[in-house]
């Protein structure tokens, strides 16, 4: 027999005197509030014990206690987020035992605003959530707190809606689409102008990368670049027609995403953060997208077929004429197309600027493959030749290991189920997961786990990707998620990041960082990861 009856008997023995007292003072209804809370906790406890017996699971090995009625945890997270250290705090929970008492624990239980959560960095649990037990988990509240900005798109939908979105979008990321690197070159020429104007002085290259990727992403998605890099500081003006809301789009998009990240921390209480500035930003973003959607809808099927070149929105308009569907999918892909690549490039050049030996080794490979400076053979850079650059791939892999684009995510159980690890001695036994329970997985912590990557897990070392152990990582390395929801735009992001890196190292022979720059850097986590304080670097021309 289970221990549940003894738990119940002990509970009843504890509360019986209290119940008798409440009966004598029945007019004072508030005496019953603690009784209700205790009863609900007992029911939850008994349900957990029942599931553990049913699934042959063990109790969670590590549970974080919050003695402030679960109110302090979200405040702590919001504080650290405002300082750019929330993701470092998430890693320190495990590595420095800030809250987790067992240094070997990879799965813990905690509560936020009274809501029980599971937090894991265990690759086996990540594999279960994303792949082997995919149908046991859904996006939960993600649709609710992202809907106001992204609507019903591939990143917010579950079930049949998600499958339909994926079927509709998959052809748009076929190899022939993502391999057209030559479309990036005009944007690179403008980027070069911005870097040269600093004459070797310190500047924030992250800000330029975000402008570069929004320009290239809008050209790919809309057929018309936002041309945010073309400004008076480099003697250029946009060549495309201006319209109301265009100039405000980038700032509004950034603000709305930042606000969404805070809503994520509050989980079911996300609706608290819905201020006027947030709503105004969303309206600007929607107006920007609607402008292009309307232009696409004004084209007949015959017009669309006659269009030369590839434009994501036009191809999508051949499948649906619903303006909301077009806007929602467009914004979902724009988040990934702009932010993922910009973040990757920013972290890559941040690390190269403080690791001159890695920078030199990468330039040597690029010189051998494509030449440098006046001898650069730009016409030889292609999807195929970029894939043959082994050290470049290692540098990108290492960047995505230490700084994964989506460092923290969650799912919600759709049924009573289990996770393979986290219970019993050493946390190696299965644990029971209740229907509706939130399970968070922190890929940033997985990618920096010393049990997996060794004592130098926090060190930027691309050479590890040539070692036999690293080639057997499996679910310990998932920079683009995994399973059925693996990122459709993975090759798009990797190809663009590779091309930009090669072209910058062909053009600039020196890359430095202020020796007083803080390390590890503070991290900004909105829907994707970026540098909280930018990437301040110095770049010099090849002479």
Curated annotation (Swiss-Prot):
Q: Which InterPro entries match?
A: Cyt_P450 (IPR001128), Cyt_P450_CS (IPR017972), Cyt_P450_E_CYP52_ascomycetes (IPR002974), Cyt_P450_E_CYP52_fungi (IPR047146), Cyt_P450_E_grp-II (IPR002402), Cyt_P450_sf (IPR036396)
Q: Which family does it belong to?
A: Belongs to the cytochrome P450 family.
Taxonomic lineage per UniProt? Eukaryota, Fungi, Dikarya, Ascomycota, Saccharomycotina
Please give the start and end residues of each transmembrane region: 29-48
Which segments does the topology annotation call Cytoplasmic? 49-543
Q: Which GO terms describe its cellular component?
A: endoplasmic reticulum membrane
Q: Which CDD domains match?
A: CYP52 (cd11063)
What the record says about the induction of its expression is: By various alkanes.
Keywords associated with the record: Endoplasmic reticulum, Heme, Iron, Membrane, Metal-binding, Monooxygenase, Oxidoreductase, Transmembrane, Transmembrane helix
Which of this chain's residues are annotated to bind heme?
A: 487
Q: Name the EC number(s).
A: 1.14.14.-
Please give the name of this protein: Cytochrome P450 52A1
Describe its function: Together with an NADPH cytochrome P450 the enzyme system catalyzes the terminal hydroxylation as the first step in the assimilation of alkanes and fatty acids.
- All ranges on the Lumenal side of the membrane: 1-28
Tell me the GO molecular function terms.
heme binding; iron ion binding; oxidoreductase activity, acting on paired donors, with incorporation or reduction of molecular oxygen, reduced flavin or flavoprotein as one donor, and incorporation of one atom of oxygen
Do you know which SUPFAM superfamilies this protein is assigned to? Cytochrome P450 (SSF48264)
The way it spans or sits in the membrane comes to: Single-pass membrane protein
* Localization per record: Endoplasmic reticulum membrane
Its gene name is CYP52A1
Q: Name one Pfam family in it.
A: p450
Reported cofactor(s): heme
